[in-house]
Each structure stands twice: as C-alpha cells, then as structure tokens.
C-alpha cells in the first residue's frame, strides 16, 4: 500500500525546496507547494530564490525532467511533507503553530486512505499529535493514529531535519535521520519514504521524543556558544585576549570551547531552545540563561563599536555581513542584522552594509536613511570603523586598522 510514486512537499523554503528536489532527483514525482506565487513561478522556470550551493543545478535538472512542479495548492499524493516556519507569537517566545495548522487543513482536502503525513518543521513537544487532530477535524471520513493506532487510515510521523546551511544537499543524504512515528507502523512507513534518498541511518522512535530530540540538539549547541560568548565578555572586562585563552584551554584533552561571535541566529539554534523554555519555564533554567546570554551579545558588540567612534564627528561604520552565518543569504534571527538596526538608531552614524549574498537591503533596513548597501571596497575606503560581523569568504582576508575586535 505504501508505494511512494508521488510526494507533496508543503513549504518551499530553505528545507522544503532541497527536500523536494532530492526526492525528484530519485525519479519521484514531486508537487512543491508554497503560498508565495512568485516563489512558485521562479521554481517552475527551473530557478531558485535562495542561496544554497548545488541547489540551483539540482532544481534546474528536476524541473526540466518533469519530476518537480511547484504550485500554490496541494494535490493528491502518496506522502505529504510539511516544512513550514514555526516562528514566535509576540515577545514572550510563544510558539506560533499557525503555519502548520494552515498546511494541515490544506492537505486534508486531498488526503486518501493509505497516505503518509510527515511534519518536518521543528516544533514544540506535542505538535505532531496536534497536527493529527487538525487533520481529523477536517476529515471525519478517515481514521488517524490518535484514534485507531496501528490500523489508522492515515500514518503520521515527525521527522526533523538536521542539516547545516551551505551543506544542505550533502547532509540531507548523508546524515542520520530521526523518525518519530505516532505508532510503530507510522515510523516504518516514514523510514521507507526517507530511505529513497537517505544514506545515513534512519532511527525509529516516537513522535514526542523526535520533537524533543531536535530541540535538545540545538539547545546543547546554544549552551556551548553561550559559554564562549560569556567568556568573551569576561575577557574584555579583565583585559585578556579571549582567543588566546580559548586556544590554551583547548589544549586540555577533554576541553573543546567554541569560538565566540556577535550572537546566535538562524531559525534553529536561536529559536528552538525557547520552545523548551516556554513549555517548561520553571525547569529549563540553564537553557533560558544561555538564550539570554546569546541574545544579549549584539548589545555588547554595539557598545564596543560606539566606544570606538565616540570621538569621531559624523562617523561612518562599515558592517560586514548581515546573514546569520557565513556564505548564505538567510537573515532570520540574525544578530548582525540586530546590530545594524541598533547602530542605525544613533542618527549621527552612517552605516555602510556589505552583504555579498543579497541584492537589496531587507525591509527592516530599507526605511533607514543612514544605511546603505555597498561593495566591500567602498566600505573599507569610506568607513572610520569596520566591524566584521559575519565571516563570509569575501571577508576572511580583510585587514585594516579600522577593524573593531568585539570578542
């Protein structure tokens, strides 16, 4: 029954589009769904709207070969993969599951007995079960795992992605995959689907554990980054070179301190720990503290830069990089973007932004009169102070006495 000839992927962003393209490259018919008509049109021309090495070639091939088609509405398929955003509601870090609910209701209309539905979106514990309830509300003619267990008409699983931006194509194929079924049979169905392209091990568990696994992975990484960032703040106060300190401490055979930076960004590490904290505010104390340390690091960077320009009349500040990590165009939760916004609020300063992976400033910056997107050479020539916020490959060789060390 679970022969996967056609897969429908909901959400064609940084995870959904690569996933759709890889399935299509294995000669599976793929329907990619996105509510943004512009994205749909771009993909159907065999082009891409994001920066990810190798993805442009892959999408061009599978679209031309007829295995990938983009549309704004779901179609009947054997398996459905939901890969939509899970942002926050307001300032209290409440998870916003609206996109998952909308995606669930959209695919419910075309579900048929024997289908598999997979939630890939990183989600708070219990979201997969909630998704099953949303589907059941829309389709009373079908049975779901929370109602009928192993004999349900529809199989449901949570299978979180765990890939590195810039290495997505390779890691989707090579990385181990956590497969969290609402029942064992649900997990078995999902493993068969992912084994179409996954060369790593597919490890079976339940949906709630799979949800918590992804949140735990990113919380662990956040904690380690917070330790490095807190060290950089302490060393600044104590007049110690943090880079030398970490290098020496790491000579201990059981110590591996990470490198500090200007904060933590992206839609994983900067977001996922808050899902744990929101559901468990009294227990997740260390996780919360780490988030606060990393969220506050941009303020520390801003103060360092302001100290450097305090005696300059009408200073020009070059900010190199806006993305949340090197060599990508993803600005979600970027600490570099936060730093630029804070600096721009000091109206006496002009900000020269260099971001080689975008063609125009994001909307948050477009209404700021004292911010310009410029090339690297112009920024280095005109700026009084240079802050390398993101170590894009274009910036690695930058050497200037104007560069501010903020760690």
Swiss-Prot record:
Asked if the record carries the keyword NAD, the reply is yes
Q: Which GO terms describe its molecular function?
A: NAD binding; oxidoreductase activity, acting on the CH-CH group of donors, NAD or NADP as acceptor; UDP-glucose 6-dehydrogenase activity
Q: Which reaction does it catalyse?
A: UDP-N-acetyl-alpha-D-mannosamine + 2 NAD(+) + H2O = UDP-N-acetyl-alpha-D-mannosaminouronate + 2 NADH + 3 H(+)
Enzyme Commission designation: 1.1.1.336
GO BP: polysaccharide biosynthetic process
| Role of this protein | Dehydrogenase involved in the biosynthesis of capsular polysaccharides. Catalyzes the NAD(+)-dependent oxidation of UDP-N-acetyl-D-mannosamine (UDP-ManNAc) to UDP-N-acetyl-D-mannosaminuronic acid (UDP-ManNAcA).
Record-stated family:
Belongs to the UDP-glucose/GDP-mannose dehydrogenase family.
Its protein name is UDP-N-acetyl-D-mannosamine dehydrogenase
Protein's organism: Campylobacter jejuni
Q: Taxonomically, what lineage is the organism? A: Bacteria, Pseudomonadati, Campylobacterota, Epsilonproteobacteria, Campylobacterales
State which gene encodes it: HS11.16
């Amino acid at each position: 029954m679970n022969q996967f000839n056609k897969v429908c992927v909901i959400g064609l962003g940084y995870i959904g589009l690569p996933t759709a393209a890889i399935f299509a490259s294995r000669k599976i018919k793929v329907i990619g769904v996105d509510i943004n008509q512009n994205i749909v049109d771009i993909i159907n021309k065999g082009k891409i709207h994001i920066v990810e090495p190798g993805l442009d070639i892959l999408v061009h091939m599978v679209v031309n070969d007829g295995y990938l088609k983009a549309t704004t509405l779901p179609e009947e398929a054997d398996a459905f993969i939901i890969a939509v955003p899970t942002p926050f509601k307001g300032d209290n870090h409440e998870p916003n599951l609206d996109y998952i609910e909308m995606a669930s209701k959209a695919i419910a209309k075309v579900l048929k007995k024997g289908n598999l539905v997979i939630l890939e979106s990183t989600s708070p514990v219990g979201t997969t079960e909630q998704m099953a309830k949303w589907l059941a509300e829309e389709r009373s003619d079908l049975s779901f795992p929370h109602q009928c267990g192993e004999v349900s008409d529809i199989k449901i699983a949570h299978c979180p992605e765990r890939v590195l931006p810039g290495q997505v194509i390779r890691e989707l194929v090579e990385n181990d995959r956590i497969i969290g079924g609402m029942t064992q049979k649900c997990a078995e169905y999902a493993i068969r689907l992912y084994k179409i392209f996954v060369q790593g091990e597919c490890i079976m568990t339940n949906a709630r554990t799979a949800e918590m696994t992804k949140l735990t992975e990113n919380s662990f990484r956040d904690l380690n980054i917070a330790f490095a960032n807190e060290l950089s703040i302490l060393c600044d106060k104590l007049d110690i070179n943090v880079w030398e300190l970490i290098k020496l401490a790491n000579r201990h055979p059981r110590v591996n301190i990470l490198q500090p930076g200007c904060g933590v960004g992206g839609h994983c590490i900067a977001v996922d720990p808050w899902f744990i904290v929101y559901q468990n505010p009294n227990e997740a104390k260390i996780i919360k503290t780490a988030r606060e340390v990393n969220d506050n690091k941009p303020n520390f960077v801003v103060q360092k830069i302001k100290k450097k320009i305090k005696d300059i009349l009408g200073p020009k500040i070059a900010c190199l990089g806006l993305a949340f990590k090197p060599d990508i165009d993803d600005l979600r939760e970027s600490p570099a973007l936060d730093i630029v916004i804070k600096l721009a609020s000091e109206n006496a300063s002009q900000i020269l932004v260099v971001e080689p992976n975008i063609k125009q400033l994001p909307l948050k910056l477009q209404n700021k009169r004292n911010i310009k997107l410029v090339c690297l050479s112009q920024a280095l020539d005109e700026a009084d102070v240079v802050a390398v916020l993101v170590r894009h490959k274009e910036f690695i060789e930058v050497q200037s006495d104007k560069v501010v060390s903020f760690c």
